[in-house]
């Protein structure tokens, strides 16, 4: 209401201002409503255009977008039900994004920069073994699939801040296997466009945390350069606590490794970029794990190929200037380490329980110095065991010096091994083993010396159901054990000397080494009075006297 006390000119000006204000508000409101309505009409055209843009950048994958909405006033873009599928294995989709939002990062407008802020809510990544196999067989590396370009093509403004809220990642090895599950992933990264620290190698900061395999926790803090090509570079400090190792058993079985129980904790720093790879693990601790390597007749060829491949990989990565790997300390505590041979008749199992192992200074560069290993435990549950020595992991093949002591193992626990390789067993007795194994310049030397005491091979009560030939053989072996017994120590002692050249054009040094030591151990653990066993060539070494 215009006051009547004002002069006519003033009343006119006041009335005009009110009309202009009302007109401006009406027009502005109409524009807002029109823009709001138009934005909804644009949604139908926007969705297929964005979908086509993403697919033009992706290689080997394709995107399907359920809904897209652009608010024209604030330029906020909302995407719903974005699904990414692998062309080779489209089911299940490798990624689903229920909600994605792109908006202007208003804080940066103060500095005169127009950049975007992206948020993902409840994203889910599902990967199975078939998809991983297809990726390995592809000629295009995963990092060159066009992920960065596909994401940046969606929104006209460059992304400078990125956040993930409550993400979920699963890997399924095969039908029926429990998935590997990373849950409750939260990540925030800013300065992606290198605005504030353009001269810094890794200008972007990021933080992340997640639940690992339902019980473990992983936190990440570091810096990145998301503009590096062909893939982003990062340097990350990580802390992992209590990750259950049994979760990876379905995958580890493909390499003949069975894992039961156990928890892994570790901390360190990893730098990975197109120019350099640095892995610096300060500590890794495994508690209460049961690890069994199972040798199978049907996988024998694959096992040999795997050993050769691992050996070549080690040789390739050793002393590479752009690759630096170092593990300061690995501790395995209160665990069981086992070797199962299912290729023999009967099969047998060798194990050390109550294992405590410390491995220090493991690296891939010779100038880092030798690594040290110290292991204690109970061989076959009874033999007090200590293995200690030094080795160089950065050589062209195995290079180390190791001492082994196994005291007073119950010999009856080795009956499956004796039956498999000696075709006899024992009724009682104990075994002590001393060994020294050294490898340098592709030559192996040393000895394995077992000593047996209180051995009783034939027992009329326990062996009454055996055939007459087997009974006779065990009686002869038992008599031979008495003949070859050291009368001072009342022990049967034998020795297998190790010597040889690991260089072989048909097998790797690592494969040759493993085969020599395995054969020597089997030959040594069979009592020296079993003359059917042919020892390897004599070599050097100074074993303890029997």
Task: Label each PLM-derived region with a short phrase.
Residues 2-25, 229-231, 271, 277, ...:
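Extended terminal
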Residues 23, 99, 140-247, 252, ...:
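Elongated, acidic membrane-bridging lipid-handling scaffolds
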Residues 126, 246, 285-301, 305, ...:
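Outer-membrane beta-barrel translocator/pore domains, especially the C-terminal barrels
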Residues 10-87, 149, 156, 205-211, ...:
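N-terminal amphipathic/hydrophobic interface segments
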Residues 67-133, 147-172, 196-198, 203, ...:
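Flexible beta-edge/linker motif
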Residues 88-89, 252-256, 420-422:
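Extracellular loop and loop/strand-boundary signature of outer-membrane beta-barrel proteins
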Residues 132-140, 298-306, 421, 464-469, ...:
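Flexible, surface-exposed loop regions and adjacent strand-edge segments
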Residues 120, 238-240, 284-286, 404-406, ...:
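Transmembrane beta-barrel strands of outer-membrane/channel proteins
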């Amino acid at each position: 209401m215009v006051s009547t006390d004002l002069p006519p000119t003033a009343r006119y000006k006041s009335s005009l201002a009110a009309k202009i204000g009302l007109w401006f508000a009406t027009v502005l409101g109409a524009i807002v409503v029109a823009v709001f309505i138009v934005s909804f009409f644009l949604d139908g055209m926007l969705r297929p255009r964005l979908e086509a843009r993403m697919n033009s950048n992706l290689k080997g994958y394709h995107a399907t977008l359920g809904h897209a909405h652009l608010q024209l006033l604030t330029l906020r873009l909302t995407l719903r039900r974005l699904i990414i599928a692998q062309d080779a294995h489209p089911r299940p989709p490798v990624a689903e994004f229920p909600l994605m939002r792109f908006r202007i990062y208003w804080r940066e407008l103060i500095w005169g920069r127009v950049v975007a802020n992206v948020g993902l809510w409840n994203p889910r990544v599902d990967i199975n073994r078939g998809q991983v196999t297809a990726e390995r067989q592809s000629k295009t590396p995963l990092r060159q699939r066009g992920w960065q370009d596909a994401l940046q093509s969606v929104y006209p403004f460059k992304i400078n801040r990125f956040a993930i809220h409550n993400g979920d990642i699963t890997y399924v090895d095969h039908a029926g296997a429990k998935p590997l599950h990373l849950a409750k992933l939260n990540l925030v990264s800013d300065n992606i466009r290198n605005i504030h620290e353009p001269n810094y190698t890794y200008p972007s900061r990021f933080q992340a945390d997640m639940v690992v395999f339902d019980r473990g926790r992983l936190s990440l803090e570091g810096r990145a350069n998301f503009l590096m090509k062909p893939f982003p570079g990062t340097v990350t400090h990580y802390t992992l606590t209590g990750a259950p190792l049994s979760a990876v058993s379905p995958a580890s079985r493909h390499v003949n490794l069975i894992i039961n129980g156990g928890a892994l904790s570790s901390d360190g720093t990893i730098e990975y970029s197109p120019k350099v790879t640095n892995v610096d693990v300060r500590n890794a601790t495994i508690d209460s794990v049961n690890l069994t390597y199972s040798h199978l007749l049907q996988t024998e060829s694959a096992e040999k190929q795997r050993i050769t491949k691992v050996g070549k990989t080690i040789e390739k990565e050793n002393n590479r200037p752009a690759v630096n790997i170092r593990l300061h300390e690995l501790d395995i505590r209160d665990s069981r380490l086992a070797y199962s041979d299912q290729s023999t008749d009967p099969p047998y199992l060798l194990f050390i329980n109550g294992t405590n192992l410390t491995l220090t200074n493991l690296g891939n560069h010779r100038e880092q110095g030798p690594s040290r290993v110290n292991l204690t435990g109970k061989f076959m549950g009874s033999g007090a065991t200590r293995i200690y020595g030094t080795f160089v992991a950065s050589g062209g093949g195995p290079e180390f010096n190791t001492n082994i002591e196994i005291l007073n193992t119950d010999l009856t626990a080795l009956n499956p091994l004796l039956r498999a390789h000696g075709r006899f067993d024992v009724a009682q007795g104990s075994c002590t083993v001393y060994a020294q194994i050294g490898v340098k310049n592709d030559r192996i030397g040393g000895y394995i010396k077992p000593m047996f005491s209180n051995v009783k091979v034939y027992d009329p009560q326990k062996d009454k159901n055996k055939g007459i030939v087997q009974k006779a053989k065990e009686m002869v072996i038992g008599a031979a054990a008495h003949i070859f017994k050291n009368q001072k120590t009342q022990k049967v002692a034998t020795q297998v000397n190790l010597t040889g050249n690991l260089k072989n054009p048909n097998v790797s040094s690592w494969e040759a080494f493993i085969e020599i030591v395995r054969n020597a151990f089997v030959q040594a653990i069979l009592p020296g009075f079993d003359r059917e066993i042919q020892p390897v060539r004599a070599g050097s070494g100074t074993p303890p006297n029997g």
